[in-house]
């Protein structure tokens, strides 16, 4: 999977840009504030229907413009797609795939599997469980065709149950939700645990490359006591849930935890080590997708040199070259990218939202 062409109109300070990309490495160089991260953000938005920096569309649309437009050409082996997305200030989103209206963001996301590595991405390790659930759910979305519908139904039922908790006074009135909720909770949890286990060896192998001085272990927690029947737990905790106004236990509390030498990674690793572990997790997941589904991820790396010494940069660059994916890398200077010497690459220079091909 690769983006061969990208047109951007009125996305932050990127007013009118039309770029053709290399299937391998694409280097984006420029000073702070030049628009490097905005270019990665636009690529990410095209594949997710949202930003990794801001949830407010008005902050992304260029000043005094009614909307932004993204249009991309995507190639995978013998297939080609044309995708477009327009976001209006009023909040409306228009999407097209090969000229036809796309109804769901998931249609775009399926076409463009992406791995994002940014300085803020350490939340995967030191943030709340929701970041690690998203990590597992991303993988399941691309591996299991049935997962998205089950996951969506589960979230819808949880919202309905939480709303009902604030209105009912007896558990009997919740049973209609809990029968289906229990079934979906077990299904989603089973898939998550199986996927986490399938990833384990790939994660351990990649961590050994980047952090050989540490023994990294992973563990999945489904969100409630494995010795408890979930239906019984929902009934047993009804009064507590009603007092809280939401469902306390369940797959919405699941976590995928990481330890280094037996201790939580967020407690003992330096920022540089955390970044290496985050890179290892993203690479392991992308390579697992390639092995299982023969699909390449697109890797987006913002501020390549941040937190990494020269040797670790070289390791990361070599691993990215080896997996054969399309890669977008930002840096302030060319010297920060000297560890990456791919055969196929393009270099772009950004200044005040304007770009040129070097």
Curated annotation (Swiss-Prot):
Q: Name one GO biological process term.
A: DNA synthesis involved in DNA repair
> Which controlled-vocabulary keywords does the entry list?
ATP-binding, Cytoplasm, DNA damage, DNA repair, DNA replication, DNA-binding, Nucleotide-binding, SOS response
One MF annotation (Gene Ontology) recorded for this entry: ATP binding
Q: What does the record list as coiled-coil region(s)?
A: none
Cystine links in this protein are none
InterPro entries hit by this protein: DNA-binding_RecF, DNA-binding_RecF_CS, P-loop_NTPase, RecF/RecN/SMC_N, RecF_2
Give the UniProt subcellular location, in the record's own words.
Answer: Cytoplasm
Principal location listed in the UniProt entry:
cytoplasm
Q: Does the keyword Zinc apply?
A: no
- RNA-binding as UniProt keyword: no
Sorted alphabetically, the Gene Ontology cellular component annotations on this record are: cytoplasm
Which residues are recorded as binding ATP? 30-37
* Transmembrane intervals: none
The domain of life for this entry's organism is Bacteria
Q: Which PANTHER family match?
A: DNA REPLICATION AND REPAIR PROTEIN RECF
Q: What does this protein do?
A: The RecF protein is involved in DNA metabolism; it is required for DNA replication and normal SOS inducibility. RecF binds preferentially to single-stranded, linear DNA. It also seems to bind ATP.
The family line of this record is: Belongs to the RecF family.
What is the name listed in the Swiss-Prot or TrEMBL entry for this protein?
A: DNA replication and repair protein RecF
Naturally occurring in which organism (per UniProt): Histophilus somni (strain 2336)
């Amino acid at each position: 999977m690769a983006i061969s062409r990208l047109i951007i109109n009125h996305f932050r300070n990127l007013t009118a840009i039309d770029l053709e990309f290399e299937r391998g490495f694409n280097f984006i160089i420029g000073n702070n504030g030049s628009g490097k991260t905005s270019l990665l953000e636009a690529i990410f938005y095209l594949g997710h229907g949202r930003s990794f920096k801001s949830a407010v569309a008005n902050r992304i649309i260029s000043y005094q413009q009614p909307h932004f437009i993204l249009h991309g050409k995507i190639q995978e082996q013998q297939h080609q797609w044309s995708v477009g997305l327009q976001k209006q200030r009023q909040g409306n989103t228009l999407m097209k795939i090969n000229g036809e209206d796309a109804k769901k963001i998931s249609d775009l996301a399926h076409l463009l599997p992406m791995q994002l590595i940014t300085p803020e991405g350490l939340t995967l390790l030191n943030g709340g469980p929701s970041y690690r659930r998203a990590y597992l759910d991303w993988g399941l979305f691309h591996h299991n065709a049935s997962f998205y519908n089950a996951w969506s139904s589960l979230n819808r039922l949880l919202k309905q149950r939480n709303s009902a908790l604030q209105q009912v006074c007896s558990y009997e009135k919740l049973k209609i939700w809990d029968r289906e909720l229990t079934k979906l909770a077990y299904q989603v949890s089973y898939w998550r645990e199986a996927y986490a286990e399938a990833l384990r060896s790939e994660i351990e192998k990649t961590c050994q490359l980047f952090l050989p001085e540490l023994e990294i272990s992973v563990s999945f927690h489904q969100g409630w006591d494995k010795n408890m029947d979930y239906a019984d737990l929902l009934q047993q905790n009804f009064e507590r849930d009603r007092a809280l106004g939401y469902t306390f236990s369940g797959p919405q509390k699941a976590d995928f935890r990481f330890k280094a030498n037996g201790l939580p990674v967020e407690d003992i690793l330096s920022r540089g080590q955390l970044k290496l572990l985050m890179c290892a997790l993203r690479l392991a997941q992308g390579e697992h997708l390639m092995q299982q589904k023969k699909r390449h991820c697109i890797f987006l790396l913002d501020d390549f040199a941040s937190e990494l010494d020269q040797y670790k940069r070289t390791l990361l660059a070599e691993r990215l070259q080896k997996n054969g994916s399309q890669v977008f890398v930002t840096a302030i200077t060319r010297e920060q990218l000297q560890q990456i010497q791919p055969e196929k690459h393009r270099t772009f220079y950004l200044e005040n939202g304007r770009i040129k091909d070097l």
